[in-house]
Amino acid sequence: MYSSATSPTPIATRTALRPPTAAAGRPGPKQVPPPSRPAVPRGADGRSADARGQAARTALGLRSPETAPPATRAPGARIPAARPGDGRLLRPPMRPGQPAVQERIDPSALQTPAVRAALAGVSRICPAFTPRQVLREGSRHILVAGTIGRAPVVAKCLAPQAVRSEYFEQLVADFHHEVAVYRAFVRHRPPVRLPRLVAADHDRCVLVMERVPGRPAARERHPVNAPTPGEVRALLTAVRTLNLWRPPTDVFQPRLDYQLEIARYHSVGQLTDRDAGDLRGLLHGLGHGPLQLCHGDALLSNMLLAPSGPVLVDWEQAGWYLPGYDLAVLWSVLSGDTAARRQISQLAQSGGTLARDAFLVNLVLVLMREIRLYDVPGAGEEQRIMIRRLYDDAALARRAVRAAVGTR
């Protein structure tokens, strides 16, 4: 819910795709290379390269250049530019239409050493904070619901045991970034709903936010049951509204070095020589295009369905990306909803050829990350099914990239 759904390892940022500001690195996932899959030989399926490219475009919902209508934009508008969650949820999910119940203080959950240490940090900045319920106690973050007076709030703290994590420095950097993002939103209000900042302690990694009524659009990173079509439309509208927002360029920073990401996945065998060359070719054409403000972790678990509309939470990865990064994340986790994927693909290409190419670059890198997160030894049957689906999606995205390169 409010805790981060990704925990990449730190990387050095050296991309030329950035607004005029210093770049901030986006970490990569834990280096556990998946078993290499043999590349399908060209023509092995009995179809020509053009036929396979057209099939990939069709499956992704992308029209061929000959049939695609010209891009339409509002006057003056620019081209729109996992880990599996750790910790344990201590509150059962609320089903749609289920009435809210009175929350009671759970003394046992509030008395664990980690929670007590977190509450001590919260009390330093909010002495009036009254804890009510532990929403999540994980190895990286602790979430405690409570009140300040009559106002419901949520306190998010870095877990004490995170000090022993090999990614501790990156966890601290991400937490500091999220605090900075919430403070920036106080000065530059975004056009989407998000929890209001109540208080923050940058040094102790404590963040107190308004508690928004609602339920997550999904509990899992890759949900089996997708939201309803109406909910999907509302979520996509919220994401696109954020992506089209143009705050001052010095308020946020780039969060992903695309060239370095391509090189990293290429070095571990997830991308072939041709894959890496095709992606670099698309990147070359996007080198001088605008970047887009993205949430950076637009999973369904980071979106609340509230009575007033969708609410976006967990802003640790917010920043400048190539256009369509949030759409690529949503496409990757909505494998069971063909209609939603079609909507996402249509939105991705609505900005023209450059927006389509940027979406494809994002999609391949996001799928490589998901495969790297889940394709690990000891996976259960359900996870192996999901891994096979991710490999199929990645092959589809590769073919679409090759088709896009062929139209340049």
Question: Over which residues does each language-model region extend?
Answer:
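A conserved alpha-helical element in kinase catalytic cores
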Residues: C157-V198, N225-A238
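Active-site activation/catalytic loop segments of kinase-like enzymes and analogous catalytic loops
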Residues: G324-T353, L363-G380, D393-A394, R398
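Juxta-kinase regulatory segment immediately upstream of eukaryotic protein kinase catalytic domains
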Residues: Y2, R57, G61-P65, G76-R132
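Active-site acidic catalytic loop and adjacent metal/ATP-binding pocket
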Residues: R136-A155, G281-Y325
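An alpha-helical support segment within catalytic cores of ATP-dependent transferases
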Residues: P113-C126, L244-H295
